[in-house]
Amino acid sequence: IFVYVKLTEGKNLLLLTMMKKEIKFSLVYRDMWQSSGKYQPRVDQLVRIAPLIVEMGCFARVETNGGAFEQVNLLYGENPNKAVRAFTALFREAGIQTHMLDRGLNALRMYPVPADVRRLMYKVKHAQGVDITRIFCGLNETRNIIPSIKYALEAGMIPQATLCITYSPVHTVEYYAGIADQLIEAGAPEICLKDMAGIGRPGMLGELTKAIKEKHPEGLI
């Protein structure tokens, strides 16, 4: 499909700006690991698909573990630690960054995890080949996220702090931008806009991205 676009400074400033920037893609999974069993991959299947992802040549990052990923390993009777090493190996060789999901205060669980265990978790995951951790709290409670940012940095990982997006009179651009300020000030070099339910309004998300970038131009969103 070929699309002809007449470029003018007035009407297509955004497109012109994007053309001057390097665009990278990150492969992120959502509900596959949380759906019915037939869609939950075993480690032998992940290892088989990894070369194809590399061969595509369009991904700078690939999500490889954390959260539901490692719970599925346990359900299959697999060792999550061995699974992480096996799945990340080829991506590391290809120079593709790998990233995981963690639940802040809850780490990879559904209930709070002691601070010393969380600190050790990041060291272990980094040693297993994981570069980035996407840290989120469903309540956007910064006290559940900021300690994990610091622990991840100590372990040599890149902490990607998350804003869980929803739609209500309370959840405004100012609300989210204020949280982003706190997370970036705590050391997070990246911010993720996590629209788990798919109800974020494009206009609001655009305004939020602009607000964060204007105040933190070096940050990655």
Whereabouts are the PLM-identified features?
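Short hydrophobic alpha-helical segments enriched in small aliphatic residues
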Residues: 3-5
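Targeting/processing segments of secretory and organellar proteins
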Residues: 8-10
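N-terminal amphipathic alpha-helix/helix-capping segment at the start of soluble metabolic enzymes
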Residues: 16-36
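Short, well-ordered coil/turn segments that N-cap beta-strands
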Residues: 21-23, 58-60, 92-98, 129-132, ...
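Conserved, mostly hydrophobic/aromatic
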Residues: 32, 135, 191
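Catalytic domains of carbohydrate-active enzymes, especially glycoside hydrolases
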Residues: 48-65, 124-132
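Active-site beta->alpha loop and helix N-cap motifs at the rims of alpha/beta catalytic domains
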Residues: 66-179
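Catalytic alpha/beta core domains of metabolic enzymes, predominantly
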Residues: 196-221
